[in-house]
Amino acid sequence: MLKFTAEHEWLKFEGDIATVGITSHAAEQLGDLVFVELPEVGATFAKDGDAATVESVKAASDVYCPLDGEVVEINQAIVDDPSLVNSDPQGAGWFFKLKLSNAADAETLLDEAAYKELIA
């Protein structure tokens, strides 16, 4: 199941674990990324908490935690090579995996059609 947020993040769910990243739209708006800072494994966040930071040649932006949960894995590859986020934002450019406090909260997120309408 793939869901989206109004803050341009995507979540792919596998049970109570969500892989989180920024959308292709967000990556295009930011331009070429030069720096990514990710949360530490074990960090817990409330929905909309500042979970990560990205910097591009144009701007710096926070990446928010889309749901309450605990970070169980990070993608070190994008720290080492931020351009992965630009080249494959909804694949190899994922940010972190989140163990959800309440998996039912996923129902509050946007589906793909609603997200496409938001960015149209």
Curated annotation (Swiss-Prot):
Family: Belongs to the GcvH family.
Co-factor remark: Binds 1 lipoyl cofactor covalently.
Recorded GO CC terms: cytoplasm; glycine cleavage complex
Cofactor(s) named in the record: (R)-lipoate
Record InterPro entries: 2-oxoA_DH_lipoyl-BS, Biotin_lipoyl, GCV_H, GCV_H/Fam206, GCV_H_sub, Single_hybrid_motif
CDD domains attached to this UniProt entry: GCS_H
Function: The glycine cleavage system catalyzes the degradation of glycine. The H protein shuttles the methylamine group of glycine from the P protein to the T protein.
Source organism, top-level taxon: Bacteria
PROSITE patterns for the chain: BIOTINYL_LIPOYL (PS50968), LIPOYL (PS00189)
Species the sequence originates in: Agrobacterium fabrum (strain C58 / ATCC 33970)
Record domain Lipoyl-binding: where: 17-99
A GO biological-process term: glycine decarboxylation via glycine cleavage system
Annotated S-S bridges: none
Upper taxonomic lineage: Bacteria, Pseudomonadati, Pseudomonadota, Alphaproteobacteria, Hyphomicrobiales
Protein name as it appears in the record: Glycine cleavage system H protein
One Pfam family from the record: GCV_H
